[in-house]
Amino acid sequence: MGTHDGIRYMTSEQEWEQVLQIKTAGRDDSRSDTEHHPYEPTDYCVLERLANSGHIRKKNTLIDYGSGKGRVSIFMAYQTGCHSIGIEYDERLYEKALINGESPATRNRVSFVLGDAALYELPD
């Protein structure tokens, strides 16, 4: 682990995957086309900075469009205490997100929706 400005940061993707008890690593472009990008998880260092920015708090609900295997939703719920809804159109990635969402790190604050993000209606 490293520190910057007094904030603790993990040093590797593998460390975060172990802490969160999830499997989200690796690129998957098997279902990409002109309308859909490949699955490529957001780096944990980017998520650490976002979580520590103060923009997302416990009282917030994060909507993760194109949630893939659920890394952003799970990480942000773990780090900030927010609720998170991941929306994914690829059924294979959605199924993996559901498995990852069972992580004790989420404390039932994460849910996933299978569907087109453009058609998703935001909750009140």
Residue positions per predicted region:
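Short conserved loop adjoining the S-adenosyl-L-methionine
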Residues: 119-123
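Conserved class I S-adenosyl-L-methionine
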Residues: 59-68
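Conserved short alpha-helix immediately C-terminal to the canonical SAM/SAH-binding motif I
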Residues: 92-93
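Conserved SAM-binding loop
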Residues: 97-98
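Glycine-rich SAM-binding Motif I of class I
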Residues: 70-74
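Conserved SAM-binding motif I beta-strand of class I
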Residues: 83-88
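S-adenosyl-L-methionine
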Residues: 1-57
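Conserved SAM-binding strand-loop segment of SAM-dependent methyltransferases
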Residues: 106-115
